[in-house]
Each structure stands twice: as C-alpha cells, then as structure tokens.
From Swiss-Prot:
Task performed by this protein: Synthesizes alpha-1,4-glucan chains using ADP-glucose.
Enzyme class: transferase
EC number: 2.4.1.21
Protein name: Glycogen synthase
Gene Ontology CC entries for this record: cytosol
The protein's annotated pathway: Glycan biosynthesis; glycogen biosynthesis
Binding positions (ADP-alpha-D-glucose): K20
Family stated for the protein in its record: Belongs to the glycosyltransferase 1 family. Bacterial/plant glycogen synthase subfamily.
Pfam families: Glyco_transf_5, Glycos_transf_1
CDD domains: GT5_Glycogen_synthase_DULL1-like
A GO term, aspect molecular function: alpha-1,4-glucan glucosyltransferase (ADP-glucose donor) activity
Biological process terms in GO annotation: glycogen biosynthetic process
Record organism: Aliivibrio fischeri (strain MJ11) (Vibrio fischeri)
Stored InterPro entries: Glyco_trans_1, GS/SS, Starch_synth_cat_dom
C-alpha cells in the first residue's frame, strides 16, 4: 500500500531564521523542515514584517485584494528557508513596524485587527498560489486561531478547502488573543457581536478560543501539557473549552535542533566533546574552566550550576530567590544569564555582589554564553511555574548537564528523576511550587556530586544519549495529520 504524501500549510506569526521572539519560532522552522525531509509537501505562511519585506530575496509574487476589508490590497512575498517555500503576507498598514507585537513593552493597539487580517488573508491567498489543495492547515497559538473558525464558517462550501482539515498547536495558553468585538469587526462574521465559538463575554472574544472550538484537532507541545490544559490552573481559565475537545486533544513533545545544540559540532564552546565518558569529562572540564574565566569566578573544581532564562515568575525565579543565599553557603558556583523583570534583576545583582566568589549574574541574553553555560555546567536549574514544553532541559542533557526541573508540562515528560529511577535517570525533579522543595532537590544534587562524582558522570553520559530529534516528533505529527484527515 502506497502511503499518501501530505500537503501541509504551516501558519505561524514567526519563524526562526527569519524573525523570532520565542519558542514558537523554533518549532515553525524545525517541524516543517522535518516534515519535508520525511517526504511531505510543506509551505509556510507568515506576516511580512518590516525586516522580512526588506530582504533582497523576498520577491513579490502576488498583489491582490482581500474582499470586505477596509484595507483591501496586500502583497505576498516569496522566500525560502531550509528549502521550504515561505509566503509572507505584506500590508504596510499592519506589518511595516519596528517590532512584531509590541514596542516599549506596549502591545500594538490594533493587534486584534492585524492578526484577524493575517488569518483572512492566509485563506484568501492559498487558492491563488497553490496548485495542490492542502490536506492540513496547521496553525499556531492565538495569532492564527481565527483560521479554523473561518474554514468552518466562511469557507465551509468552498471547493478548494472542501477536504482540508485544520490543526491548532498550543504553545502557551496564557496568551489567548482577547480583543473587543469592535477591534476585529472588519471580519463580517464578528460585526453582530455574537460569535459563540469565540466569545468570552458580551463585549470580548478570544482568538485562541475560536481556534480551540473550531480546529479539527488540537495539539499541545508536550503530553503532560495536554493534561494540564484540562485543568483551570494549567489552561489559565480555559479548562471547559479544552474539556469539550478532550477527545481531539493530543500532546506531542517538541524536538531539539541538534544542528545547533550538539557538543560534538558546537562552534561556540571552547572545547567540543563526544558522547563517551573520556571525551565528555575532558570537554566539560575545559568548558567549565572557560566559563569561570568568562564570568570572573575562581578557577575551582566545584559543582557548577547554570540557569539561562527570561527573568519572569513563569521561569520560577520566585522559588529560587528566597533560598538562593542559603544555597550559596555551600561549596559550589552558580551562573545565571537572562533579562526581564527589573525587580528580579536588581535582587539577583545584589546577591551576586555579596557572593562574587560563587555567583555570577549576567543581565543579558548572549547566545554564545548560553552555549557556554550549557556545556560548562554540571547542573541546569529550571524550577518553572509552568512550562508547556521547554527546550533548555533538552539542550542540557545533550551537553551532559543534568537538569533540575519542576514536574510541569514538558519538563515532566522529558526528564527522568534520579530519585525515582536511578538506572534511567537524566536529572532531578521536584513537584510542588515551593522554595524549600527546590532547595531540597538542589542539595540532593550537590550531595551526590560531593559524595559520588563517578555516579554523576554516569548519569551525565546517560543524559547525553537521549534522543529528542525533530524527525521523531514529526512522525507523530504525521500520524496525527492522517488521523485528522480520516476522521
């Protein structure tokens, strides 16, 4: 039996390699690439932000009109990433701006209208550009949540989309795309102020809710996050919507881009190393010494803890700060790299000044330094409040750095806790969002390091052998696509 090649349109608000603000962009680059490598037809649709429209390789291939819209004209630019065609929708009114979503920490006032337009234009352009009808339109987060709704309503009788099915990926349900009806009234379906699939009140709608209600299949970026979305806490108030669609909700853990995060080929780190004990021990020792020198910590062979994150409560800084000085009384070193909340940054700066022989805080995001922290640390701290998937724990394991995580979202799916399964352990974990629980697991890791360094090296090597490649994740997506098409 010949397996049908699928035609997939992947729609996202950002794509790594073109423009990026977070993990969505990583997925929007890596998953289509893997789907193509597995033999499927893939196109990407995204907005043509200012930096994209200005690229020399972004050729205008279509100038057209979007009916029933105040600003009807738009253009489509064509470019390529990893051999995949990208259609970038250009409209000076909406995307010719300095940033994607906000300036000076203020969201653009017309974000609702901007991404309503983007959703409508996406469905308008595909029949004009594609020779083959799409089997799947895969949309991501609230920015594209109206696409499944429009497919069900506006395009229900459209011959081009008659066999097309939609998949919505939830990367972070905190962001729901909530807007007043008037902000997206350019869509004729919303002029009446009565769209039950999207309404959260008499005056406001959620674009994410519209997608959850109308997509043929819903995907969370880890199996455990899919379970959390069924709870009020995990869904941030949308539990009933996800519960209504529970039979169509599936969790697939994101993959890792090993072309960038691979200690054997990493051009950033001072010494590359392979997945064998001798190479790992020598490589990590050299990387630790270089990291110590880079952040002005003493050259000592002590347990090195690393953390690279945004300084927000989501990342669990509020659990670390109350116990940090107590933890630093021990013989260890800690490097934290990140930017974000100025109050949290000020407190970390203060503690670093008081413990300059043990703790370095770098208030910046530096990709090279992030690689150095992953390679030079023995342990990586991720005490997240919530973490739909998480990637740093996967990067850490690739570099033989043991993640210390809270058991939420994808962290629970990807890290095997030492105290639960010593033989198959790849890190340490704790359950409850409490500073003392974090301190206990930190001390547990430090005790193992000080008493049985050989065991730490064994676990580090086992962690390096884990495989989270994107092609494995892509196979699960293909299975989901086929189930969606056949259901």
């Amino acid at each position: 039996m010949v397996t049908k090649t699928l035609s997939i349109v992947f729609v996202a608000s950002e794509v790594d390699g073109l423009i990026k603000s977070g993990g969505l962009a990583d997925v929007a680059k890596a998953l289509p690439k893997s789907l193509k490598e597995l033999g499927h037809s893939v196109q990407i649709v995204m907005p043509a932000y200012k930096t994209i429209a200005g690229r020399d390789d972004a050729e205008i291939i279509l100038t057209t009109q979007l009916e029933h819209w105040p600003h009807t004209a738009y253009q489509v630019r064509s470019l390529s990433i990893d051999g995949i065609s990208v259609f970038a929708i250009e409209s000076g009114d909406y995307f010719e701006r300095a940033e994607m979503y906000a300036e000076n920490n203020q969201a653009y006032a017309d974000n609702g209208e901007r991404f309503a337009f983007f959703s409508a234009a996406t469905l308008d352009l595909l029949p004009k550009l594609l020779n083959k009808k799409p089997d799947i339109i895969h949309v991501n987060d609230w920015h594209t949540g109206l696409i499944p709704y429009l497919l069900k309503k506006r395009y229900a009788e459209n011959e081009f989309y008659h066999q097309t099915r939609s998949v919505l990926s939830i990367h972070n349900a905190v962001f729901k795309g909530i807007f007043h009806y008037d902000e997206i009234a350019c869509l004729s379906e919303f002029k009446s102020h009565f769209v039950p699939e999207a309404s959260i009140s008499h005056t406001h709608v959620s674009m994410l809710k519209a997608g959850v209600q109308c997509a043929d299949k819903i995907n969370a970026v880890s199996p455990n996050y899919a379970k959390e979305l069924l709870t009020e806490l995990g869904s941030h108030g949308m539990a009933s919507d996800f519960q209504d669609r529970e039979s169509d909700l599936i969790g697939i853990l994101n993959g890792c881009d090993y072309s960038e995060w691979n200690p054997e080929k990493d051009s950033y780190i001072p010494k590359q190393f392979k997945v064998n004990r001798i190479s790992m021990v020598r490589g990590k020792k050299a990387c630790k010494a270089a990291l110590q020198q880079e952040v002005s910590l003493p050259q000592k062979d002590v347990a090195m803890y690393g953390m690279v994150c945004r300084l927000t409560n989501q990342k669990g800084i509020q659990y670390l700060l109350p116990i940090l000085e107590q933890f630093l009384k021990n013989d260890l070193q800690l490097v934290i790299v990140g930017t974000g909340d100025p109050v949290l940054a000020a407190r970390l700066t203060e503690i670093a000044q008081e413990h300059s022989d043990k703790f370095a805080f770098i208030e910046a995001y530096d990709n090279k330094l992030a690689h150095w922290v992953e390679a030079g640390s023995d342990f990586f701290i991720m005490p997240s409040e919530f973490e739909p998937c998480g990637l740093n724990q996967i990067y850490s394991m690739a570099y033989g750095t043991l993640p210390i995580v809270r058991e939420v979202g994808g962290l629970k799916d990807s890290v095997n806790n030492y105290d639960d399964d010593i033989e198959n352990a790849t890190g340490f974990s704790f359950k409850n969002p409490e500073p003392m629980e974090l301190l206990l697991v930190l001390m547990r890791s430090l005790l193992l390091y000080s008493q049985n360094l050989n065991e730490v090296k064994r676990v580090q090597l086992h962690a390096m052998k884990q495989d989270f490649c994107w092609n494995k994740a892509a196979l699960k997506y293909i299975e989901m696509y086929r189930t969606t098409i056949n259901s």
